[in-house]
């Protein structure tokens, strides 16, 4: 049986996450009291109507504070039943959450006459502390639109063919912000930039003209070898420490050329020695 617990601050994308999971065969329960988590898991295990039990539950600030405090105990009880249970935590920066609430005109679950929306959003972080501390996967949705979030959720949660650590190697552009949910970040902006070659500007690091240009640059090759040597040595240590998810981010200026090229190469070589290696290009449209 597999269970995914979805949590996060209001406005971060939890409803979208549940929709994605439901579309992919998960039985979903929204706003489950944390104290009922072990009981729900037990009932799902003995339910003969579920050929392959896939369960997703949302636990967030709508819970009683006393239930959230007990979350670590409830999670431990679930895992003692030999259930593969992942905790997903979604978040976004405060300005983005404020904007989303302003656009939808929805009421924050913690807002009152004496508590502003900004205060409610900040208080929510403290309330969800017990869940944040135990999250296996954290996704920051600040720079993701609805479709990008759905793709990210499918990639991280549903494309994990085997148990163990799932490694995501992700290219990005610094001009759109650094991915705050990355575990390791490599800055490759010091490398020769194909953008300044008019004939290469409109191509990406996935296309042969850019590949041909970057593959003969000594600094690019040296950077690749250094990053690969580091990852090849240390990623197995991450896996040995029972990490469920590790995100490695490779950044250049725009996220179209250098970071894409290196991310593709690193993904190809690491897939030869590690299981569950995924590649994503955040800023390629």
Swiss-Prot record:
Binding site for ATP: 8-15
Residues annotated for GTP binding in this entry: 60-63
Keyword terms: ATP-binding, GTP-binding, Nucleotide-binding
Transmembrane segments: none
MF terms in GO: ATP binding; GTP binding
InterPro entries reported in the protein's UniProt record: P-loop_NTPase, RapZ-like, RapZ-like_N, RapZ_C
Record's function text: Displays ATPase and GTPase activities.
Family: Belongs to the RapZ-like family.
PANTHER family: RNASE ADAPTER PROTEIN RAPZ (PTHR30448:SF0)
Protein name: Nucleotide-binding protein Psyr_4150
Organism: Pseudomonas syringae pv. syringae (strain B728a)
């Amino acid at each position: 049986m597999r269970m995914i617990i979805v949590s996060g601050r209001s406005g971060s994308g939890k409803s979208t996450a549940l929709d994605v999971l439901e579309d992919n065969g998960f039985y979903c329960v929204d706003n489950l009291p944390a104290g009922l988590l072990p009981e729900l898991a037990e009932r799902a295990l003995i339910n003969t109507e579920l050929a392959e039990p896939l369960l997703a539950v949302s636990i967030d600030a709508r819970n009683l504070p006393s239930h959230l405090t007990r979350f670590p105990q409830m999670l431990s009880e679930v895992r003692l039943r030999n259930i593969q249970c992942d905790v997903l935590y979604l978040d976004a920066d405060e300005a983005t959450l404020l904007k989303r609430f302003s656009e939808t005109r929805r009421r924050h679950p913690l807002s009152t006459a004496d508590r502003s929306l900004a205060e409610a959003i900040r208080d929510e972080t403290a309330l969800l502390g017990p869940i944040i501390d135990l999250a296996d996967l954290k996704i920051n949705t600040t720079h993701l639109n609805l479709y990008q979030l759905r793709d990210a959720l499918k990639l991280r949660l549903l494309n994990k063919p085997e148990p163990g650590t799932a490694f995501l190697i992700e290219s990005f552009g610094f001009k759109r912000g650094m991915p705050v949910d990355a575990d390791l970040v490599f800055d490759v902006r010091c490398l020769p930039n194909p953008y300044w070659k008019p004939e290469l500007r409109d191509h990406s690091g996935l296309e042969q003209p850019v590949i041909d240009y970057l593959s003969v640059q000594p600094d690019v090759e040296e950077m690749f070898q250094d990053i690969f040597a580091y990852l090849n040595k240390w990623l197995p240590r991450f896996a040995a420490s029972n990490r469920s998810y590790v995100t490695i981010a490779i950044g250049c200026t725009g996220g179209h050329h250098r970071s894409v090229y290196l991310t593709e190469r690193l993904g190809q070589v690491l897939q030869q020695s590690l299981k569950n290696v995924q590649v994503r290009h955040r800023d390629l449209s």
